[in-house]
Amino acid sequence: MTKSLLVVILASWLALPQPPQETPGLLVSADWLSDHLTDPQVVILHADMQKSRYEAGHIPGAHFLDMNQIVWEGDPAWGTEMRSLAEINDALEMGGVSEGQHLVVYASNPLFAARVFMTLEVMGLRGSVSMLDGGFGGWQEDGHEISIEAPMFNRGSISLTAQDDILVTADWIHQRLADPRTALVDARPDDEYTGEDGGLGGTAHPGHIPGAAQMYWEELVVSRQSPTVHSFDQLTELFVSAGAEDGDTVVAYCMVGWRASFTYFAARLLGYETKFYDGSWRDWGTRED
């Protein structure tokens, strides 16, 4: 091989997206992220509905991800319908995301980060997205630097391919109500699960899906204000108590798909085969069959 050809091959290889300096898991710590702020193959996404909160302070180098480009209001004031693959693809490219990069998503509201995580897995980025443990609040509590400067970046280039086996429908669930290896986990609080709320959001039939176990999503973290995820052993105990044994399929749902996003994330963290019922109780509770 001539020296000139070797130089060309090496230059071509360097032009390809390189993996992060260290492969992260689904959950990364503030210290890990602090060590990777300058890693060109790690893109940090600050997820929020309002850009003003991002502008008031964010993790250095973080790109703003508008939650309105991830979800839209299918019904007034609910804002929970997943946008199309093309729309989310465009949102990521506008956020400077390109093929081969690893995404770390965080937010002040842990449900925003979890919803983005779930959505990006549905859009084919499983293995390429992580969530920041403790969120933005945890980052600040740990004394890490905050910036008000928006980073400069070019539009990214990525081509998403949806993963069709994550989202499930009411019919899919109905066919598996008697399946002992399918664990339905309701991420809502007690009053919604029991139906004492009277039918939040105008659902015709208050209550829960037959056989579903109730595990309020906030049980998965230290607190909503300090959303550090509980230990692996603590999470395992919660899911086993909810009827999810090793090898089972966990199906997460809530009212409209926000709270269940965190349940989805926790189940993935534990290694369960995990499904997401995006229609949730707003769909099931209005059905007549």
Q: What label would you give each PLM region?
A:
Residues 1-8:
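Sec-dependent signal peptide recognition
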Residues 8-18:
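Hydrophobic h-region of N-terminal signal peptides that target proteins for export
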Residues 20-29, 35, 73, 136-210, ...:
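Active-site neighborhoods of enzymes that stabilize oxyanions during catalysis
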Residues 22-49, 61-67:
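Mature N-terminal segment immediately following signal peptide/propeptide cleavage
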Residues 49-52, 68-72, 109-112, 136-139, ...:
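Solvent-exposed loop/turn segments at secondary-structure junctions
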Residues 72-99, 217-250:
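Helix-loop module immediately N-terminal to the HCX5R catalytic loop
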Residues 82-172, 176, 207, 259-282:
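Thiolate-centered catalytic microenvironments shared by cysteine-dependent enzyme domains
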Residues 237, 242, 247-289:
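C-terminal soluble interaction/assembly domains
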